[in-house]
């Protein structure tokens, strides 16, 4: 989370939204030590991520398209599947299930969404819903489980950093390609 806050505060371009993102991340870090007990024990940072993702999805109009709802539920099911598979058959995992889930959700997000806001929203919604799904299934087996613990928060932060990095890489590659095409056109016109 600290790395996200440093990125948002010092690296990103100065905009009004950058300020809100920085405040959200800082508030989220402070809230991560608090637990909310309802049907599940929820981490306050998890609740903030979940609420912010749903509000942001609503502002983007993602709830109006069936495609986005199906994709976000698919991402949640993939997250839940990874953790349940790791629970019942852990020998198949070479890496930690948290990292496998982050990588899988990042690949799903990058392959179905083109713009960064939709990618971010889909990723966070998939992580939140998947964690809730996993906790609901585990509750019947092992009793009460904490939803949105520090492992989840770390994985979600790492996934967001990965999304920012890969989206920046895509934009950089597109600019380089566009610049090389412009330089190539000038060379053919001169000959």
Identify the residue ranges that each predicted region occupies.
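Hydrophobic cores of alpha-helical transmembrane segments in multi-pass inner/ER membrane proteins
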Residues: 2-11, 48-61, 103-113, 156-171
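Structural signature of hydrophobic alpha-helical transmembrane segments
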Residues: 1-2, 36-49, 90-100
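Membrane-proximal helix-loop-helix units in multi-pass membrane proteins
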Residues: 61-129
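C-terminal transmembrane helix-loop-helix hairpin of multi-pass membrane proteins
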Residues: 2, 112-191
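Pore- and pathway-forming membrane helices of multi-pass small-molecule/ion transporters and channels
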Residues: 5-10, 21-33, 49-54, 77, ...
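Acidic, metal/ion-handling microdomains and their immediate structural contexts
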Residues: 15-21
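Short juxtamembrane and helix-loop transition motifs at transmembrane-helix boundaries
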Residues: 2-14, 27-38, 53-65, 78-91, ...
